[in-house]
């Protein structure tokens, strides 16, 4: 059998759909939880607090939140030098390897030398970057903080002290997964390193999941108003549902219907736990695809489309996992 490998030329061919921002892994939307995160970090910078940590359960959207936070800080506070860092020390076998990894992450070309040389080079690089940026503040965003070790905290303390000698303030923002990050802090207390907790992790806050009606309304409105491509394109929703759009359909008007479906599809505790970003975005993509396919096939609008999409996203299972994690966390207290 001969297979035609040429992509279809329809407006919503698979190739074009995959390239749409709705499906791109790098698309990050300024949601209400992320806006709250930015406001808290903004205050942290203004009052010159040395650090804080945010925690959340699996699937809430921690990494995406830090990506958007980095973007917002760079745009709104250009005088602040922002350095993102992903902790993966369970795979780093030595502190020397850690320094090499960090140097590579900030673009330093020379990864040779002994541990002391690498450490000195890394600290001087951070100082030079701050000076070049004419920045009085270095904001270090640490993802996967639940993988940090005591050596990492000691390194942060060294960096803080060295930058302070040059009149530069280091502020660390850690994002870690619960209950694992709690184990990290418990180990610091067990080892008597309250100085490290005091400097970097005394202020512990929650990066919350989607839970408020305005969270969903703001997110859905973003889908209604974002244009792709930027010049002469369609709104994201219009791209998938042109006929429904012409008849006045708007995703923001679906919030009540969506929340009713959440109540039907998930456990009663779902509203209090919140909806993880991972499951929410899977459900939205699934919903838009299903309505698009139905529209193209001249089928009736799927009135229970949200029920099917939430079931596909396995929302109930994700919330059950969060509940189990919270029970485990409570037992440790």
Predicted regions and their residues:
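C-terminal alpha-helical "lid" subdomain
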Residues: 2-9, 16, 22-30, 51, ...
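Pre-Walker A adenine-sensing motif
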Residues: 32-49
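AAA+/P-loop NTPase substrate/partner-engagement loops
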Residues: 72-106
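Conserved catalytic network of the ASCE P-loop NTPase/AAA+ motor domain
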Residues: 43-47, 74-78, 130-134, 147-150, ...
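Short hydrophobic/aromatic beta-strand immediately N-terminal to the Walker A/P-loop
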Residues: 51-56, 141
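Conserved lysine of the Walker
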Residues: 62
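Mid-core helix/loop region of P-loop NTP-binding domains shared across ATPases and GTPases
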Residues: 4-13, 19, 33-38, 93-143, ...
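The catalytic "switch" region of P-loop NTPases
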Residues: 82-91, 138, 162-254
């Amino acid at each position: 059998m001969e297979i035609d490998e040429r992509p279809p030329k329809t407006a919503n061919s698979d190739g074009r759909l995959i390239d749409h921002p709705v499906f791109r892994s790098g698309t990050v939307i300024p949601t209400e939880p992320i806006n709250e995160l930015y406001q808290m970090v903004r205050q942290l910078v203004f009052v010159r607090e040395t650090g804080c940590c945010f925690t959340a359960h699996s699937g809430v959207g921690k990494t995406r939140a830090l990506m958007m936070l980095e973007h917002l800080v760079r745009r709104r506070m250009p005088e602040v030098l922002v350095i993102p860092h992903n902790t993966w020390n369970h795979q780093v076998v030595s502190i020397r390897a850690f320094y090499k990894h960090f140097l590579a992450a900030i673009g330093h070309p020379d990864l040779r030398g002994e541990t002391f040389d690498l450490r000195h080079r890394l600290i001087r690089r951070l100082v030079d970057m701050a000076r070049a940026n004419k920045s009085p503040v270095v904001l270090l965003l640490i993802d996967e903080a639940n993988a940090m070790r005591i050596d990492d905290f000691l390194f942060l303390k060294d960096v803080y002290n060295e930058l302070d000698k040059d009149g530069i303030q280091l502020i660390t923002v850690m994002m870690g997964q619960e209950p694992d990050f709690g184990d990290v802090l418990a180990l610091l207390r067990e080892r008597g390193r309250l100085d490290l907790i005091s400097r970097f992790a005394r202020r512990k806050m929650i990066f919350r999941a989607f839970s408020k009606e305005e969270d969903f309304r703001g997110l859905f409105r973003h889908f209604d108003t974002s244009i792709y491509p930027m010049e002469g394109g369609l709104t994201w929703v219009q791209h998938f549902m042109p006929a429904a759009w012409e008849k006045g359909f708007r995703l923001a008007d679906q919030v009540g219907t969506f929340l009713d479906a959440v109540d039907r599809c998930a456990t009663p505790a779902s509203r209090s736990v919140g909806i993880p970003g991972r499951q929410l975005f899977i459900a939205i993509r699934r919903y838009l695809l299903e309505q698009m396919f139905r529209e193209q096939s001249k089928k009736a609008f799927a009135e229970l489309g949200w029920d099917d999409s939430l079931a596909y996203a396995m929302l109930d299972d994700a919330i059950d996992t969060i509940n189990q994690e919270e029970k485990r966390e409570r037992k440790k207290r």
